[in-house]
């Protein structure tokens, strides 16, 4: 009798908790909770709870997971995945240009204002030590240990954050990350204004912590950068990745997900492929699982796993996506935090007076960095800065002044030049990313793909130098 009462009470509690969660999510949706500079923090608690649950469950059938992504190729089954993406490389951009309408007049939008909220992740609570219980490490006294910790903190504070850039090697399109100089040494020649001072009274803009936040993001982007050399373990990885990314963009656009979700999904996918050799006919499962993980991390309301399975046309079942999610998270050690390029673009847009024209064009150019295989291994902050630089050139704006250099993280024109050349090569070249180009030819995105392609073709035809254009 008592056991039945306990079961009934537990069911009642669970139903009340689910009801409370649904009501709280509905309230958040009705209030239009602003996204913070580090992403949507309202969903982090659920994500951490699910991750901890996955850790507790563990890999009960490890031998099965080892065979989940077999190493041998199965060409016959892979044809079912690649047959629907055999579009011509030459006809995609011409179709986009032929279907264009009258390009609308650009204007400014106050709704594009950056909104931030305070993030407590950089503040930690100090642990109080009892006077009667002293913690020793190898018979060291508390005073000696505290002095040693303070010394380490002073040494860390003296370190300057390196600024990474790209250096072109020979005639090949190979790039290598280098530490050129420190931020203070780069910016000492330029004058810039403290644009965060005007936001000191706005708690949503976190002007006091914004520098610490972006210092952390610059550190995080180096840690989560995929190793391009490891991707060559896969056969025909460039072509297969192009097909997979094109399909992911299609599903992302169909579900109406956030841009941050797409960037995170591609980053998780690239990092996983660097660690694991995947069978060709399992690539679609990898892409689906990565998009499913990213949507649960970034979105307030994530699409159901049944919807993801339905979009694969029977290639992946619900159980396959669940197994893929667990396997990918375990392989990445549940490290899915990512320095999203949208965060850096919002920061640079502050120095650009939040202009919607250049910002929309920069979104299109910045998304090229995840669809083109050449951009793997380039820092997201550098891609965001190059996209903003090139978008301003398209609109005939002024020079890359001190404010833009400072709020981009110290990227000068010389550092942006190699990445801008890669963006130009993509715009004037052929591609199979038809879903990506069609997405940005709509009025919602101010026909950014049409404007960018026409401008790039004109610049290359006349032999203009993009670095000195409109200066």
Curated annotation (Swiss-Prot):
One GO term of the cellular component aspect? cyclin-dependent protein kinase holoenzyme complex
Q: Name one GO biological process term.
A: traversing start control point of mitotic cell cycle
InterPro entries the UniProt entry points to: Cyclin, Cyclin-like_dom, Cyclin-like_sf, Cyclin_A/B-like, Cyclin_C-dom, Cyclin_N, Cyclins_cyclin-box
Query: Keywords assigned by UniProt?
Result: Cell cycle, Cell division, Cyclin, Mitosis
User: PROSITE patterns attached here?
Assistant: CYCLINS (PS00292)
Q: Tell me the GO molecular function terms.
A: cyclin-dependent protein serine/threonine kinase regulator activity
Transmembrane segment boundaries: none
Q: Name one Pfam family in it.
A: Cyclin_C
Q: Which family does it belong to?
A: Belongs to the cyclin family. Cyclin AB subfamily.
Q: What else is known?
A: Present with 300 molecules/cell in log phase SD medium.
The job of this chain, per UniProt, is described as: Essential for the control of the cell cycle at the G2/M (mitosis) transition. Interacts with the CDC2 protein kinase to form MPF. G2/M cyclins accumulate steadily during G2 and are abruptly destroyed at mitosis.
Q: What is this protein called?
A: G2/mitotic-specific cyclin-1
| Species name | Saccharomyces cerevisiae (strain ATCC 204508 / S288c)
Q: Which gene encodes it?
A: CLB1
């Amino acid at each position: 009798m008592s056991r039945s009462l306990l079961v009934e009470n537990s069911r009642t509690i669970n139903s009340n908790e689910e009801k409370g969660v649904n009501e709280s999510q509905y309230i958040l949706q009705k209030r239009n909770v602003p996204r913070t500079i580090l992403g949507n923090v309202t969903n982090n608690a659920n994500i951490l709870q699910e991750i901890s649950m996955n850790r507790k469950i563990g890999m009960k059938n490890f031998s099965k997971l080892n065979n989940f992504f077999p190493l041998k190729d199965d060409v016959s089954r892979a044809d079912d995945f690649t047959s629907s993406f055999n579009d011509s490389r030459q006809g995609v951009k011409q179709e986009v240009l032929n279907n264009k309408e009258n390009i609308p007049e650009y204007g400014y939008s106050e709704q594009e204002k950056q909104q931030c909220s305070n993030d407590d992740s950089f503040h930690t609570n100090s642990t109080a030590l009892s006077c009667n219980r002293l913690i020793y490490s190898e018979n060291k006294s508390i005073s000696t240990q505290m002095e040693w910790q303070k010394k380490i903190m002073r040494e860390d504070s003296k370190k300057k954050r390196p600024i990474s850039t790209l250096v072109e090697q020979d005639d090949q399109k190979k790039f290598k990350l280098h530490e050129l100089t420190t931020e203070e040494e780069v910016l000492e020649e330029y004058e810039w204004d403290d644009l965060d001072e005007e936001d000191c009274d706005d708690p949503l803009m976190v002007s006091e912590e914004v520098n610490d936040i972006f210092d952390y993001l610059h550190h995080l982007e180096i840690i989560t950068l995929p190793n391009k050399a490891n991707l060559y373990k896969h056969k025909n990885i460039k072509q297969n990745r192009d097909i997979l990314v094109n399909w992911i963009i299609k599903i992302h656009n169909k579900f109406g997900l956030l841009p941050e979700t797409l960037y995170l999904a591609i980053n998780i996918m690239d990092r996983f492929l660097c660690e694991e050799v995947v069978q060709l006919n399992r690539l679609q499962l990898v892409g689906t699982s990565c998009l499913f993980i990213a949507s649960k991390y970034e979105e307030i309301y994530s699409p159901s796993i049944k919807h993801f399975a339905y979009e694969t046309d029977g290639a992946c079942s619900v159980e396959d996506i669940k197994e893929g999610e667990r396997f990918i998270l375990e392989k990445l050690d549940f490290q899915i935090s990512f320095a999203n390029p949208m965060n850096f673009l919002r920061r640079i847009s502050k120095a650009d007076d939040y202009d919607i024209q250049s910002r929309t064009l920069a979104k299109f150019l910045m998304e090229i960095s995840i669809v083109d295989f050449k951009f793997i291994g380039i820092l997201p902050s550098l891609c965001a800065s190059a996209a903003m630089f090139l978008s301003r050139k398209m609109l005939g704006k002024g020079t890359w002044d001190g404010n833009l250099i400072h709020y981009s993280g110290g990227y000068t024109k010389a550092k942006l030049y190699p990445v801008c050349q890669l963006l130009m090569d993509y715009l004037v070249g052929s591609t199979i990313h038809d879903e990506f180009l069609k997405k940005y030819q709509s009025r919602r995105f101010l026909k950014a793909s049409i404007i960018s392609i026409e401008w790039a073709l004109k610049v290359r035809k006349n032999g203009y130098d993009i670095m000195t254009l409109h200066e």
